[in-house]
Amino acid sequence: MENDLICLGVITSSHGISGHVKIKTFTENPEDFTSYGTLTDGINTYEVEIISIISQNIIIAQIKGIVSRTDADLLRNKKFFVEKNKLPNPTNDDEFYYSDLIGLNVVLENNNVYGNIKKIHNFGSCDIIEIRLSNSKKSTMLPFTKDIFPYVNVKEKYIIITLPEVIGNNSDIQR
């Protein structure tokens, strides 16, 4: 996927019998999901209309041309993207897009480089930062919280990490 595309959401399931889909949105406000025009999966484009907002990050939507549950079921796990230049620019230093974090150096409070950000995941409960450790081919994953990552500087390409207390073997962690 090109770096200039930002994922706005993913279809989690069909909804009903008339081709509606349930979409998990990654926008700050669910109603913004369709505010940026036509969406793409990287190959095809889609016109999406919000039917209802279920929760802070779940919407029911109709996709143009999808008219049956069978059609909708075929789209399960499809991700929708928009060109980054169609999105508003962050207005504060503490605002950023998650895609801007990929590749940033992860720096300990003593200024030693711990690694760099490989990927950001969300397995349901919270966002997880995957870090490729320096001096190793290993990766580690930590929850993306203010306690663990108190400072992000996208312009200077680094993020500060305060390592949490670890239960069990922490021999891979170099402080």
UniProtKB/Swiss-Prot annotation:
Subcellular location as annotated: Cytoplasm
Protein's name in the database: Ribosome maturation factor RimM
Organism (species): Ehrlichia chaffeensis (strain ATCC CRL-10679 / Arkansas)
Keyword match Cytoplasm: yes
Domain PRC barrel: 93-167
Keyword check for Chaperone: yes
GO molecular function: ribosome binding
GO cellular component: cytoplasm; ribosome
GO biological process assignments: ribosomal small subunit biogenesis; rRNA processing
Entry's family note: Belongs to the RimM family.
InterPro entries (alphabetical): PRC_barrel-like_sf, PRC_RimM, RimM, RimM_N, RimM_N_sf, Transl_B-barrel_sf
Reported function: An accessory protein needed during the final step in the assembly of 30S ribosomal subunit, possibly for assembly of the head region. Essential for efficient processing of 16S rRNA. May be needed both before and after RbfA during the maturation of 16S rRNA. It has affinity for free ribosomal 30S subunits but not for 70S ribosomes.
Entry text on domains: The PRC barrel domain binds ribosomal protein uS19.
Subunit structure: Binds ribosomal protein uS19.
Keyword tags: Chaperone, Cytoplasm, Ribosome biogenesis, rRNA processing
Cysteine pairs bridged by disulfides in the record: none
